[in-house]
Amino acid sequence: MAFSKILPELLGEILQYFRQDYRILYSCILVNRLWCNSAIPLLWENPFSFMRPKNLHFIEIYLYDLNDDEKTKLIEYGMDKNLFPSNTLFKYSSFIKHLDIYKISKSIEDWDRTLATKNFRKSNFTKLICRSLIQLFIENVANLHSLHVLYGSFDDIFELILQNSNFIGNIKNLQLSHLEMSVSIIKFLTFLSSNCNSISSLLYQCYNHYEHQQMMGNGLSQIIKSQKNLRKILFRSPLYQSLLSLKNSNCSNTLNTIIFYYIEFKNIIILNEVFNQLNVLESIHIIYCRYLDTKFVQQIININKPFKLKSLFLHEVSQFEPLDLLLQHFGCYLENFESRVDSKPQLLQLFKSVTKYCRKIKSLYLHLLWDYRNINLVFNLIENIKQSLNYLSIDLCFVTDTKNDFHSIILQNLGQILPFKLEYLNLCLAINESDLEIFLKNSQNTFIKELSIKNESHDLYVTIYPCIKEYIMKKKKVKYLTISDKFNVSWFSSKDIEEFRLYDIQILKYSYMRNFDVLYKGDLSMLLW
């Protein structure tokens, strides 16, 4: 009862803390009118992107606000008129903050399947619903904060958004993904550079032919130059023009984070020239990039401005010596590391260097492709970063090991070296009950907020449920749990899910969390909107 009398300003801060936990927010709306009025906007600012299992009937609640003509069109497509609510308590469409057009379309398709109406799935139905919802958001003067445009999901509502420039005029986070050259895309990029100058986070990925790169680069450069408060940017391609646009730009005193994503640095020689003009640069992130050779590393090392290398994700190592030099200079700042390297000699050298120079890693993702005789290097690395480690993933999906010895050694030795608390642990291993029991017994001192297990065992009849029930459910050692087989089929029945819920443990569908996602876990500024 005392909690229901919290001051409104304090209540707002409390609810903001739980904005990613929809179950808690749902509980809050039941407390009293004040709590309800404060929690509802948070629940409805981004309903299409809930990472947890969601009730797709929220789409029907949106449809209540459509005008009669639009409702008639949907009924003509076969929609049951009884699906429209008789009334609603709020103008829910006015609360939308984050617009991901692909996720809207996907949610509509999933909702359509749940209705299972034979005449319902006509080809243009999803497009019609999507366009109707966007029109609804515009009409209700939604104050849009984030926009994600994905190639193929945008054409049908492109003109609708351009005709209502105020709708996206104040966006702070812009994500342009998988774009290809077209008249509409160039028109949209021009529109953004002229009408949206308050973007703080920009993610830009395009896949276009070489002859179109200059036009796409020009479009991105104009957007960058027009910004007044750009703080974070992700480059994929084209790099040269867009990177050069940072020189003498408005963002020289605002840009603090640069992410290089799948970039080939082979002919890039302007890093020093550009970075030395960025006065508040704090960190760079190198994600699956190529040609991290001596020429690249020397450019990075010779930059005069102080900054930190926060992330390094590798899928190949062409030259180890430059990489070792990079780790010597920046390893003490490294927080996110992933290895997909399949060359055994280079991988062994890499693990030794990371263990030696990097002691502050928070998220560690390992795709191990080599034999168990060197597994102590993995254990040494985990032990070395134990105090800072929050996210850990170990994937042995592609290890050829007929007896599963490598998998067993991991399970039998991992539990005792884990920190006292982990936000996330993902294990993709061939698992048997005895090895899992050893792991769970040894990790009893560790609370794991989200435990994700994918059993790669070829024995489809192996049963680990009693072990899970004994050491996880009854001891309440996790908050979220997902277990699946190698075909991503969940092992839990509806009865199991309800039983775990009694112990305050939520069963999720298997969804592998990439290390790249961890960079933005709980941060709506970029990927996880």
Residue ranges with predicted function:
Residues 100-105, 122-124, 148-154, 175-182, ...:
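Concave beta-strand-loop units of leucine-rich repeat
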Residues 19, 23, 40, 44, ...:
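Short amphipathic alpha-helices and their capping/turn residues within compact interaction modules
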Residues 16, 20, 37, 98-101, ...:
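Ordered, helix-dominated protein-protein interaction surfaces in large eukaryotic regulatory proteins
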Residues 355-358, 363, 368-529:
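Leucine-rich solenoid repeat modules
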Residues 1-231, 241, 247, 252:
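N-terminal adaptor-interaction module of cullin-RING ubiquitin ligase components
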Residues 2-3, 11, 78-88, 91-98, 108-136, 139-146, 165-173, 194-201, ...:
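Leucine-rich repeat
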